[in-house]
């Protein structure tokens, strides 16, 4: 018996480059742009526009030293606000700021078919609109989803009076595959300081007949939890990563293609969509290992251990 009647979907994300970015309302104004003639002090931060990264000065009297090459004078902090939703971290967010603090918009030209998209670690948003616009056929996909809060428990009392929680992610897997040259437009609307942790999209591969019951999901917590010599507990809250163990029914005629595909994406972060009804079975990360059991003449079983990114 399977937990999901649909196949396991694996999305190998498109690596977003500056050449793909057609338009956005997120400016690169986190810090001043680095200038060769400016003197920087210890701890001062700058942006290198050529790679959209933030760097921090490691010394005083820092002048004329290129952050890209002078590694004893500069340390890389991370991407600019514009590019945080495209890095390999779910925790870091692109935040709506500047003159427009309630919308985040991107127009991208991936140069390939996009059949699935996920927005992860989204905070303070009310809606997300995704469109595919082809130069010849016009708008070929247009869908808007809501981030309206939902009751934590079922029942009429909880619907009207119980606690509610806002979704932090949205997944779209119904995008058409016939428009490889279409522009991808993504628009978020929300409250002040809205943030998007990861915007992941690409072509999806489907394998198997469904996930078996017995799937295990959880998190790996990287918080600091120590006890001092006097018995005091020291707690420092840090990032966490989702994790999951899936057992998948597969047809034996797709066994080789599954193994070859998984081998090709080793150590590559992908989007894993287990069962649509359980948000916990949707992860952005990599598989640690997998095993395929040829159990029956027509069907087999595949066990996957997946670790999400922080």
Label every model-predicted segment.
Residues 1-95:
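Tryptophan-rich substrate-binding surfaces of secreted polymer-degrading and adhesive proteins
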Residues 2-18, 79-99, 107-310:
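Extracellular/virion structural assembly segments
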